[in-house]
């Protein structure tokens, strides 16, 4: 050990003692790494490379599926928008048809009510007219009877009554 201190104090020197410098140990380790490391690391690297390639392939497959799904979703969206537009147009047309039908029924109902009111008015006018005719006839008969009773004698009255009964019987 003193020798190494002496060399260190005297300058740069090489220690050629193989066992002290661990050159053999380093050579064994280097040879072991050279011999076994490529198989071990190579296998690990190959497995890692395969895993990465498989992950990339899976990612590409998922991307392709996602792209296809997106394309299909866009087609479905387009189809749904067309259907929604058609439904909207159909609903507007149906609403317009219902509105026109409702207006038509309202006009018809108003005409029917107006006609019914006119018919009721005509019936009432006919009833009142008939009643007025009966009243006028009754008054005329009463007036005629009152004037005739003073002008007719019993024989003429008897003849007039028989003729009136005959006229009533003909009706």
Swiss-Prot record:
Signal peptide coordinates: none
Localization annotation: Cellular thylakoid membrane
Residue spans crossing the bilayer: 12-34
InterPro entries reported in the protein's UniProt record: ATP_synth_b/b'su_bac/chlpt
GO CC aspect terms: plasma membrane-derived thylakoid membrane; proton-transporting ATP synthase complex
GO MF assignments: proton-transporting ATP synthase activity, rotational mechanism
Main location: membrane
Topology of the protein relative to the lipid bilayer: Single-pass membrane protein
Record keywords: ATP synthesis, CF(0), Hydrogen ion transport, Ion transport, Membrane, Thylakoid, Transmembrane, Transmembrane helix, Transport
Keyword Ion transport: yes
Described function: F(1)F(0) ATP synthase produces ATP from ADP in the presence of a proton or sodium gradient. F-type ATPases consist of two structural domains, F(1) containing the extramembraneous catalytic core and F(0) containing the membrane proton channel, linked together by a central stalk and a peripheral stalk. During catalysis, ATP synthesis in the catalytic domain of F(1) is coupled via a rotary mechanism of the central stalk subunits to proton translocation.
UniProt subunit comment: F-type ATPases have 2 components, F(1) - the catalytic core - and F(0) - the membrane proton channel. F(1) has five subunits: alpha(3), beta(3), gamma(1), delta(1), epsilon(1). F(0) has four main subunits: a(1), b(1), b'(1) and c(10-14). The alpha and beta chains form an alternating ring which encloses part of the gamma chain. F(1) is attached to F(0) by a central stalk formed by the gamma and epsilon chains, while a peripheral stalk is formed by the delta, b and b' chains.
Family, as annotated: Belongs to the ATPase B chain family.
Name used for this protein in its record: ATP synthase subunit b
Protein species of origin: Prochlorococcus marinus (strain SARG / CCMP1375 / SS120)
Gene name of this polypeptide: atpF
């Amino acid at each position: 050990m003193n020798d190494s201190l002496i060399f260190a104090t005297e300058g740069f020197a090489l220690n050629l003692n193989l066992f002290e410098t661990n050159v053999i140990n380093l050579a064994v380790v280097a040879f072991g790494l050279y011999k076994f490391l490529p198989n071990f690391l190579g296998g690990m690297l190959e497995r890692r490379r395969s895993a990465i390639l498989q992950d990339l392939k899976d990612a590409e497959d998922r991307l392709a599926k996602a792209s296809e799904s997106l394309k299909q979703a866009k087609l479905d969206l387009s189809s749904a928008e067309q259907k929604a537009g058609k439904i909207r147009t159909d609903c507007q047309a149906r609403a317009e048809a219902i509105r026109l039908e409702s207006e038509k029924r309202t006009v018809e109902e108003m005409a029917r009510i107006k006609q019914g009111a006119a018919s009721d008015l005509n019936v009432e006018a006919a009833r009142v007219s008939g009643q007025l005719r009966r009243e006028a006839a009754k008054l005329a008969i009463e007036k005629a009877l009152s004037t005739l009773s003073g002008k007719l004698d019993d024989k003429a009255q008897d003849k007039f009554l028989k003729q009136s009964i005959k006229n009533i019987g003909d009706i």
